[in-house]
């Protein structure tokens, strides 16, 4: 996950989650503030459709070093792998994803409200998952790749 600060007429943050295997982005949560408890709630919501991850790779932001997040992960046996400060390449998938999000969506829109930001960012996320093929997964969309993997694993 990552936490992107987005100055505009409104100040908001975007919490992003990317599956390193499928390249899918199951959620981008947009709000004025996103703390450790909110991150835990978001990951619990994802559990219903995706299960829990074995590992979470994240930076050392306060939402990831919070007691709520660390306790949640420990109770579920989830490994937390913190990247070293100043070494974003240790979390290359999310850094690449966040760069695309910033360049293709955040820097090309002037958001007038939190609702507007959420709508535009969600449309971008759907396009990223369902329309855009990725060379790293055989020129399939992340949604196609994940669906194929699930059917082969069944």
Where are these regions (language model features)?
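Charged DNA-binding/catalytic regions of mobile-element recombinases
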Residues: 1-154
């Amino acid at each position: 996950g990552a936490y992107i600060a987005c100055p505009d007429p409104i100040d908001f943050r975007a919490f992003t989650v990317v599956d390193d295997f499928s390249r899918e982005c199951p959620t981008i949560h947009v709000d004025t503030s996103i703390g450790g408890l909110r991150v835990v709630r978001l990951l619990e919501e994802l559990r219903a459709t995706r299960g829990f991850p074995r590992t979470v790779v994240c930076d050392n932001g306060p939402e990831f070093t919070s007691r709520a997040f660390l306790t949640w992960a420990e109770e579920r046996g989830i490994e937390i792998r913190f990247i070293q400060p100043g070494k974003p390449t240790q979390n290359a998938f999310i850094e690449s994803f966040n760069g695309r999000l910033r360049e293709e969506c955040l820097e090309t829109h002037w958001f007038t409200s939190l609702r507007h930001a959420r709508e535009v960012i969600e449309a971008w996320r759907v396009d990223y998952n369902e329309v855009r093929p990725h060379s790293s997964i055989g020129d399939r969309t992340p949604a196609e790749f994940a669906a194929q993997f699930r059917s082969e694993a069944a």
